[in-house]
């Protein structure tokens, strides 16, 4: 269990569950998933029980006396699924609107997808030339990886973000459609040429988070990873000064 928790911040071969959440949005998605799975397991158990009874007693006439017409049974198998759907729908809609809401961001980062790399722009900060701070992020080739770096996930210039800060991500593309997806942050947003999509995030713990382009964008589609380093506000400001 401890090993599983340690590895859940990054994609793992044959991974069977979500990566560890680092934002309220992702925490809500995981909770919704667990609730929906509870109702699905209940329904699966009920249907399996009914099928077993039908197959086990298929030679007896008595069990089928009220099977083809029974007002109580019809009411039960209509009311209970309807209640389950409502109990799944309300939390789902609340989470959907919460994820779309951009709440007074303290800073904005623009991510632009290109074949086959990402370009990040920190709109709230200027460099020494008085221009908006921006840089490009390329995947590190396999033959240049250092010990501890991840194949097809590590990049030469990661995005750096402060924790406990409301951030707005503005996503677009310059050539074809891409997709900015960061599982641990609960972010998955299309990067469309000529269109500026936005989402928000509040990273609650320091760490390194990985994502990958999730829209088929060409031959090197699998070579467009994203890497976010979440640091304290002081470390973030020190990093800004170094750029």
Curated annotation (Swiss-Prot):
Pfam families, per the entry: COX2, COX2_TM
InterPro entries: CcO_II, CcO_II-like_C, CcO_II_C, Copper_CuA, Cupredoxin, Cyt_c_oxidase_su2_TM_dom, Cyt_c_oxidase_su2_TM_sf
Mitochondrial matrix compartment residues: 56-74
GO molecular function (one): cytochrome-c oxidase activity
Lineage: superkingdom: Eukaryota
EC number: 7.1.1.9
Cofactor, free-text remark: Binds a dinuclear copper A center per subunit.
BP GO annotations: ATP synthesis coupled electron transport
Binding positions for Cu cation A1 per the UniProt entry: 178, 213, 217, 224
CDD domains named in the record: CcO_II_C (cd13912)
Similarity comment text for this entry: Belongs to the cytochrome c oxidase subunit 2 family.
General function of this protein: Component of the cytochrome c oxidase, the last enzyme in the mitochondrial electron transport chain which drives oxidative phosphorylation. The respiratory chain contains 3 multisubunit complexes succinate dehydrogenase (complex II, CII), ubiquinol-cytochrome c oxidoreductase (cytochrome b-c1 complex, complex III, CIII) and cytochrome c oxidase (complex IV, CIV), that cooperate to transfer electrons derived from NADH and succinate to molecular oxygen, creating an electrochemical gradient over the inner membrane that drives transmembrane transport and the ATP synthase.
Protein name: Cytochrome c oxidase subunit 2
């Amino acid at each position: 269990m401890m090993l599983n928790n340690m590895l859940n911040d990054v994609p793992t071969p044959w991974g069977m569950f979500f990566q560890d959440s680092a934002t309220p949005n992702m925490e809500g998605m995981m909770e919704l998933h667990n609730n929906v799975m509870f109702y699905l397991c209940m329904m699966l158990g009920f249907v399996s029980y009914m099928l077993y009874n039908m197959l086990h007693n298929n030679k007896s006439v008595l069990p089928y006396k009220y099977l083809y017409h029974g007002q109580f049974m019809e009411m039960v198998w209509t009311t209970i699924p309807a209640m389950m759907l409502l109990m799944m729908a309300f939390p789902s809609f609340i989470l959907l609107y919460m994820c779309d809401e951009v709440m007074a961001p303290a800073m904005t980062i623009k991510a632009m997808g290109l074949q086959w790399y990402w370009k990040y722009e920190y709109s709230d900060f200027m460099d020494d030339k008085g221009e908006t701070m921006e840089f490009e992020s390329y995947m590190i080739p396999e033959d240049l990886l250092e010990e501890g770096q991840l194949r097809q996930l590590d990049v030469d210039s990661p995005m750096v973000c402060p924790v406990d800060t409301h951030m707005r991500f503005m996503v677009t593309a310059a050539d074809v459609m891409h997709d900015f997806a960061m599982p641990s942050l609960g972010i998955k947003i299309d990067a469309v040429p000529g269109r500026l999509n936005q989402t928000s995030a509040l990273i609650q713990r320091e760490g390194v988070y990985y994502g990958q382009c999730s829209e088929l964008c060409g031959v090197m589609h699998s070579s467009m990873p994203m890497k976010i380093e979440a640091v304290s506000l002081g470390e973030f400001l020190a990093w800004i000064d170094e750029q």
